[in-house]
Amino acid sequence: MNYVEFFNEYKKPVEELDLLKDFINYAFEKLQLKNVMFNVIIVDNESIHKINKEYRNIDRETDVITFALEDNKQIDVPGLRVLGDVYISYDRVISQAKDYGHSTKREICFLGVHGLLHLLGYDHMTKEDEIKMFGLQKELLYRYGFK
């Protein structure tokens, strides 16, 4: 069994949260993940800016930040693979959906799976890694029903 906790720390209700939960569970199934646990925290631009500055020394907002915990030996839950936390800026969900010409539903699911893949060890630092990671994201979104 997989466990994902969703925390809405945004200033308003996030109507796409149930869809994101369903999509993450879909991704678990397609990626054949079992017994994993992680958190998704929805925040605003101000909050993610502070996190980005404090932990990455980058003085600007971003769309998604992940904190991998799997290698942290102090976090041990028997029978579970504890992956970490995914922070998503809902302000960026809104602005990027508009910029890219698609729905906020697609954008929040994109950022959710992007964060999950980072926690699983995927990255996009090289062109080869970027093609692999973004290809997998695109495939999951497409098969779920996003065009």
Which positions does each model-derived feature cover?
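Periplasmic solute-binding protein
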Residues: 117
